[in-house]
Amino acid sequence: RELRAVLAGIPKGVDAVTRSCDPVTKAKAMQVIERPFLVVRAAGSGMEGSGDLLALRGDICFPIEVKSSKKPKLYLSGRTWDQYQSMIYEGKRCELMPLYAYRLKSVRGDSWRIFRVDVGRLSGRLGILTRRIPELPLTRNGKPFLDWEQGMPLHQFISLVCRKSTTPTLESLDKRIKN
């Protein structure tokens, strides 16, 4: 519910998540109020591969699997492994970038970290974001897992996907896409 309110750009939700953050982090997170997402919650566990949330906006869309734990590392096995495999399948099938949002409990500041699920080559804006958003790290055996320390802080993710289109970086990215 917390992440849903933030991505939907609800000021109360953004404020609740950034309450113990420094002013710079808070300002980056507040950008979502200007460029919010329509966030749809999947009923129950959702359709296999659709994630817990679907964040939609005119220019971009992400299926998001939400996890939270007291431990900084979360290993995928059983049902969580099946969910991961389904996210890969749907991401490839629909040319989407599935994400994991991982919250570390009892952490001050930005407690959320964002990871992307590798689905191969993506085009347009998603292709550019692929280079910026970290992929799930791999164990020594080569199996993906969630390591909170290696994820992208939520405020950085918001700053990345909610920049105003007048921002020079986005204009140059759009020009590169069109050429």
Task: Spell out what each predicted region is.
Residues 1-44:
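Acidic-basic catalytic patches of nuclease active cores, encompassing PD-(D/E)XK
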Residues 88-122:
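Nucleic-acid nuclease catalytic cores
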Residues 46-65:
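Active-site beta-strand-loop-beta-strand hairpin of nuclease catalytic cores
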Residues 66-78:
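Short beta-strand-loop-alpha-helix junction that forms the active-site gateway
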Residues 110-179:
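Intrinsically disordered, low-complexity terminal regions enriched in charged/polar residues
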Residues 57, 68, 102-105:
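Short beta-strand segments enriched in hydrophobic/aromatic residues
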Residues 80-86:
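Short acidic (Asp/Glu) patches
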Residues 51, 75, 110-114:
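A short acidic (Asp/Glu
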